[in-house]
Amino acid sequence: MKQSKYVAAFMIWASAALLPVGTLASEQESWEFGASIYGWFPDISGHTSFSPPGGGGDFEIGIDQILDNLEFTLMGTFDARKGRGGLLVDMIYMGVGNSKSGVREGTIGGTPIPVGASAAVDLDLDSWIWTVAGYYRTVDQPEVKFDLLAGLRYTDVEQKVNWNITGNVASIPVLDRTGTAEAGLENWDVIVGARGNYSFGANNTWFVPYYLDVGTGDSDQTWQAIAGLGYKFHWGEAVAAWRYLSYDLPSDSAIADMNFNGPAIGVTFRW
């Protein structure tokens, strides 16, 4: 029900915001398109909790205690604009996994891993993040572009953990000392935000892009910020940027919070 409520709200907004595009643009204005491919290399932090299917206490661990290995990424953006109105679609897929031994942070059944004990942990995390937004260009000058936007962010995260606690384990129930569990989340959030760029230099070939959005829905709060430096070519542009994406999630969620923070590089083709 929550998901359908957010989808319905977005569809109402999209109908109101995007249908007038044809009247805002003159007959002489044509569609402009942009497609971007990029690499993002974030540090991942957060806190996750797993409930073993066979019973026993929950196993909790900080995501950043384990994950430091980006196995596979697929990322891209598509932009379509006519006149002052347009549509933006951004897609991120990340497959992340790692194994670590000697882990002492974390809890099992609500109790910290005891002194003299440690865990060997194998954690895999797969995430799809889609952002779809309509936007309106409020400023369209050679040096300055500025858009207001609103839309939806869809997040699908699946994670799996294997753990084995050794050492001083007398205080840990036998059932909790080793285990395998899976947990995940599927979120819909409504977002609002702004983006733009400032061009400078000879023929305005250098530019500073920026983006900010904030939203809520299934998440208590999600927000994203991007800033960087780019250079324009006849076919499009190349950009180096810093990107931060944050989720503050309900306390009863399998993932209590999650943050992605790091550099990104990419190219955009325009036609």
Predicted regions and their residues:
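Cleavable N-terminal export/targeting peptides
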Residues: M1-S30
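Short loop/turn motifs that connect adjacent beta-strands in outer-membrane beta-barrel proteins
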Residues: G22-W31, V139-K145, F200-W206, W235
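Short glycine/proline- and aromatic-enriched beta-strand/turn motifs that initiate or cap beta-hairpins
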Residues: L24-M94, G201
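Residues that define the transmembrane beta-barrel architecture of outer-membrane proteins
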Residues: E29-W31, L70-L74, D126-W130, V144, ...
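Residues on the lipid-exposed face of transmembrane beta-strands in outer-membrane beta-barrel proteins
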Residues: A35-I37, G76-K82, V132-Y136, A150-L152, ...
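Transmembrane beta-strands of outer-membrane beta-barrel pores
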Residues: G39-D43, I63, K82-R84, M91-G97, ...
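Extracellular/periplasm-exposed beta-strand and loop segments of Gram-negative cell-envelope proteins
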Residues: D43-E71, Y93-W128, T155-N187, G217, ...
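Predominantly the C-terminal beta-signal and adjacent terminal strand-loop region
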Residues: A225-W271
